[in-house]
Amino acid sequence: MIFLLGVLLFLFTAMDITKTTLSTRGGGLLTNAVARSVRACFFFAAGRRGESRLLEYSGQCVLLAVLASWILALWASLFLVLASSPGSVISSNTRMPADLWETLYYAGFTLSTLGVGDYVAAGDGWRVLSSAAAFCGLTFITAAITYIVPVLSAVNLQNQLGLLINSLGRSPQELLINSWNGADFSGFYDNADKLRELLVQHTLNHHAYPVIHCFHNCDAQRSVVPALVILDEAVRMLESLPPQVPQNRLKRRMLRKALDRHIEMLQSHPADPQAVRAEPPADLAPLKAAGIPIDESAYRPCEQAAAARREALGALLVADGWNWRHIYRQAAAPG
């Protein structure tokens, strides 16, 4: 029974490492459970506030916890297999059977390929098993460590996307005001291709490395989740403008599709519905003051039609420690 338990634990851990590090379908069961648990502990300790600096350490701790869980699970699986047969490990000096602590020690240095040599496997079968375990340990631990590199690369792209959106504007109104040249929104559409490219890549990264959701920036003006909500609200305002306002509708539609796919994917991390505050109506006065021909009677029905979408956006904000006041800051003065 102990032998079978060890084999099953090894297979489960091996599948989890393989799925997490070598596929684009996200993390395994163990990885996702550890990531959610550690992230939830940090979120609770931070008081569910996105501004808390404590959350900036959650991503690193999640990665370390996942790596530690893989190593401990592999170690435990080999220990259970060896412990299932007393005498499977013996002292190289006295030839006496190893006790449980010594067997645990042997399992650890076998997986890590340290090869200390003070304890050895007894019998050809256990020697072959120890060699196979050493090869597996070397392979899986190397894969686990190298997994960190693409994850950090994906986090850098996430930060780049958040900074780019916020450089265009710190609120939906400010983004449009900064892009308006008195005749069209060429300032926005000149950056639309770059935004869409980064957003698509960020979505793919989220599918491949869901742990990047745990990496947090405590500055709302640099955090990617508020930035994406700002962009989504700004695109909705552009969609409600009169037809006579010149726009690149193809670029806008492609950006909207990219936003739709990303937000659908993020909704797999739901927030507590009771914690989601009602989304406020957008203040269109700054846009009118800047000379942007937006018609409130045309925009409000669009806003109401998107109520479910805005509720989902509010849930995403709450799940990351933000709310709508971080989206509708004071818009930039026209000029």
Language-model region placement:
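Non-transmembrane accessory domains of multi-pass membrane transporters/channels
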Residues: 158-228
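Cytosolic juxtamembrane amphipathic/interface segments immediately preceding
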Residues: 45-62, 118
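Pore domain of cation channels
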Residues: 3, 9-17, 67-70, 78, ...
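Membrane-interface amphipathic/juxtamembrane segments adjacent to transmembrane helices
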Residues: 24-49, 93-94, 157-173
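Transmembrane alpha-helical segments and their cytosolic interface motifs
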Residues: 57-75, 224-228
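Membrane-interacting alpha-helical segments
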Residues: 15, 31-42, 101, 105, ...
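Soluble C-terminal extramembrane regulatory/interaction domains of multi-pass membrane proteins
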Residues: 178, 191-194, 213-216, 220-335
